[in-house]
Amino acid sequence: SLTAKIDNAWSSLRNDWKLFAERNMLRDPYGTKSVRRLMERFFSSQDYQLDYQPTQIEANERKFDIPYICPELGQLPVIIVGDKTGDVELDMMDKCTLDQRVKGEHRQKSPHATMLDYLNSTEHIYGIVTNGQVLRLIRNTGQLVKLTYIEFDLRRMVEEDHYAEFCLLFRLMHTSRFSHSSDDACIMEQWFNRSIESGNRIRAGLSDAVQKAMEILGRAVVCGKGDGNEAFRQAIMNGEANSQTLNKELIHFIY
């Protein structure tokens, strides 16, 4: 059952995390080897089949440092990096290595920026980056103004025993969410499109509601019998106020 699979994956991650937390950093200064061991088992528990890429991936006459792909998921790209930067000061500040360019690497950008660049340069829509501590699902930004990604704090999830959050992670990140036929978008993309449609409907409904509220309040201000109403009507007659003034004040009041 699904519950049993989630429980097994959770138990496996917690056991692996104990070994990960007790690792010896002397032989792995950037944490790359230990993070890869941890996350390869993590992805396996969610039915990913990671195919390691010994050389950079070429796309559109460019090379990208994408160490893993998932062939069964349309070559879904995955970046796994160490959780240490090699810079003591940065590590002490707890800077996320997904947003930092690690010393000594040939990657010219941070892992997050590398993945985003790859997605925007190819037809791939989604990619995953992780340093063992944090996991991000990134979407290309071809049609978006803001960066779009979902982040899970794996360290806090395990160390603070947030099983409910792990259930959410499993249900969201399982391979079934990214598999698709040639005609249909994957479930993740279907969810994304529905969220945009839902947001548009909400904004349209909100716009109608705001307009109706402004009409009702506007009539009350102009036609009301109070001293303030009379003063406003007089201001309009004197040219001290106009419809734009009323509109601005109504918007300020509503929001």
Please give the residue ranges for each predicted region:
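Short, basic/polar, glycine-containing "phosphate-handling" surface segments that engage DNA
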Residues: 1-26, 75-255
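Acidic-basic catalytic patches of nuclease active cores, encompassing PD-(D/E)XK
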Residues: 21-55
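Generic structural signal for well-ordered secondary structure
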Residues: 31-32, 36, 61, 111, ...
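Surface-exposed charge patches
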Residues: 37, 41, 68, 117
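Active-site metal-binding core of divalent-cation-utilizing nuclease and nuclease-like domains
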Residues: 46-75
